[in-house]
Amino acid sequence: MERMARVTTALTGRTMFCHLDAPANAISVCRDAAQVVVAGRNIFKIYSMEEDHFVEKLNLRVGRKPSLNFSCADVVWHQMDDNLLATAATNGVVVTWNLGKPSRNKQDQLFTEHKRTVNKVCFHPTEVYMLLSGSQDGYMKCFDLRKKDSVSTFSGQSESVRDVQFSIRDYFTFAATFENGNVQLWDIRRPDRCERMFTAHNGPVFCCDWHPEDRGWLATGGRDKMVKVWDMNTNRAKEIYCVQTIASVARVKWRPERKYHIGTCSMMVDHNIYVWDVRRPFIPFATFEEHKDVTTGIIWRHMHDPSFLLSGSKDSTLYQHIFRDARRPIDRANPEGLCYGLFGDLAFAAKESLISSSSSHDSNRKPYDRRHPIFFLRRPDPTEQFENISSGLSVFEAGGGDMGWFVATAERYALAGRPLAELCDHNANVARDLNRWQVAQTWTMLRIIYCSPGTVPPANPNHSLGKSGTSLPLLNSFNLKELPSGIVGESRLEHSKGDSRADSILMDPAAINNDENEETEGSDVPADYLLGDVEGDEDELYMMDQEQPHTEEQEYVLPQEGFPLRHEIMDNPSALDHLQEKADSPHVSGNEAETVSLTPVESFSLISISHALYENRLPSDFFSPTVRDMLCFYAEQGDVQMAASVLIVLGDRIRKEIDEQTQEHWFTSYIDLLQRFKLWNVSNQVIKLSTCSSINCLNQASTTLHVNCSNCKRPMSNKGWICDRCRQCASMCAVCHHVVKGLFVWCQGCCHGGHLQHIMNWMQNNCYCPAGCGHVCEYS
């Protein structure tokens, strides 16, 4: 065909694009880099690349009836025959196309052996008639285009095949990537089993590409947002480079003539194309930002020209990118870096000029030594390498930045296994020993808030008052005449509006003998309700009017001392005179003077009674918002240890006040710090005691135990403790002849052993091996 003529001149052009009729799924170029084929669900066309634009040359979707054979998931152009194309159809058919046919329909052969969608097709780089395909059904098939059926079928014994690529240097080798994260290497001469298999990614591996120069380098990309470069020349696949991206990696392509450059595009979210230098994986070397939707296919225009990149996208555009027009993120990046060390050290890296200028203002700091530069770089072509930035590194040791307190606190804290009061007291003592006074005070306040004082037994069952030994008779005897004269006194509670509350339980004898005084003036509560029945329980005397709401809020005059002092009970005539003066005061009504206040006076104090006369405690739920704010304060200050520890100790008392996401963030941060300091036991304890379900499962999902048969050394299956290969039980106890599933102890001389306790009991009475081998064993 005239339109398929080869172009032998040097490639020229500029950044250009053309609109397609439909979104593209894959693109491929011919050997001479003059034409490109675009394939998709509703498009299958060939374009020629002119100096400054694309020209449509051929539409391969012909026929009146639409066919799924034209719905392509992948397309490849043979690099040895310009007239040969292959497509992977979404209905599981592999189709070859012969552009040399004189008819309008260029379809050549159909291979219908796959049962599900074919994800990838690949021609052998040197064998004209060899075609390889990978499908969702988990099989890979090798076709000879001179035959109607496949010549080899490869079963990965795994999930869907995502990509297949022939090695450029090894004639018989190809690589396949799978949905479960594995990569397999196959020899086309041995379809029964793969040559090598290893887990490359955490999740599906969507793509792979062999290095065009180094025969042992294989690049892979997956859903875990990573691009990894593997060295396959060693006995085991070795990861030599890793690039972290911001989205799932859909395509990877090594850049020609640049050993360390690789191009990538994402499957979702990110529409840009990135070119990475795998030696500098933290920032892209170049980016192309022209596409407005997901990029589905990328390919370098010529295998020996690194300047032209072609791409197709779901935005129905086909682009040719010129490398000189690419954006360089390094030009807009901040060349300063800041990082905290594990033990509180602060490292700061900046431009050498910045450090040199700042050092002139700080004569005490040692200037940066130019004899030991951070980066030793050659003088490369500035358009093909990262900018050479000479940086200086300074390390600061901040005062008080030592993290020894964190380790000591984590190791000594008690989080469970004791009553709440003991946990709070223990943790307060730990914080106090480490001179963390605010933390110690916080634990003490938590004990006061959430632990009832009623659990503490009284020092004297007779409720002794003070140190003089004068005891207060039980109030249910109702003989107020026997009370000491220092107690039966006169006081008052000053009210803002003159109405008194029924808070008095001790009254003047004259008032008691007055039968006409049936109610306390200014109160709606009967006096006999306050005092209770003569034969009633003692606690009934302490009841307050908590059920009947008051119409007006009471206002009281607060005492001058917030915490009343405890006084001894003694006869003090001056106290009687003092009380009498208060009773004669014109500001006090008669009945108010007869009431006895709970506020302590100079001569005595009812606070000395071990049991409160009435319940003056607020419920612990009242303080929950305050405790929540306190935990948020510690978290904002960076002390997630305190926030996570209080969450564990208080449990359901405070968990409902804090949203699940915040709790998970605190626990995750604390566990990360513990693991950085290698406090594995404390970390596991926090995971087990965590109140978040997502945290509890951390040590269950990340722990894998591999067991090998002690006889044939082969890995054990998940079916039990019997080896499938040699049909013997693993790790039998020489004493009880059962499988040892826990600690196993054995003799280093004869290699027999068993359960730890069984061997200990056996060796107490015997010196020979319990297996009967005759060896003299010793337990130490």
From Swiss-Prot:
Residues in WD repeats: 67-107, 113-153, 156-196, 200-240, 244-286, 290-333
Protein name, per record: GATOR2 complex protein WDR24
Protein's job: Catalytic component of the GATOR2 complex, a multiprotein complex that acts as an activator of the amino acid-sensing branch of the mTORC1 signaling pathway. The GATOR2 complex indirectly activates mTORC1 through the inhibition of the GATOR1 subcomplex. GATOR2 probably acts as an E3 ubiquitin-protein ligase toward GATOR1. In the presence of abundant amino acids, the GATOR2 complex mediates ubiquitination of the NPRL2 core component of the GATOR1 complex, leading to GATOR1 inactivation. In the absence of amino acids, GATOR2 is inhibited, activating the GATOR1 complex.
Pathway: Protein modification; protein ubiquitination
A molecular function GO annotation: zinc ion binding
Reaction(s) the record says it catalyses: S-ubiquitinyl-[E2 ubiquitin-conjugating enzyme]-L-cysteine + [acceptor protein]-L-lysine = [E2 ubiquitin-conjugating enzyme]-L-cysteine + N(6)-ubiquitinyl-[acceptor protein]-L-lysine
Binding site for Zn(2+) 2: C733, C736, H755, H758
Family under the similarity heading: Belongs to the WD repeat WDR24 family.
Binding site for Zn(2+) 3: C747, C750, H775, C777
Regulation of protein activity: The GATOR2 complex is negatively regulated by the upstream amino acid sensors CASTOR1 and SESN2, which sequester the GATOR2 complex in absence of amino acids. In the presence of abundant amino acids, GATOR2 is released from CASTOR1 and SESN2 and activated.
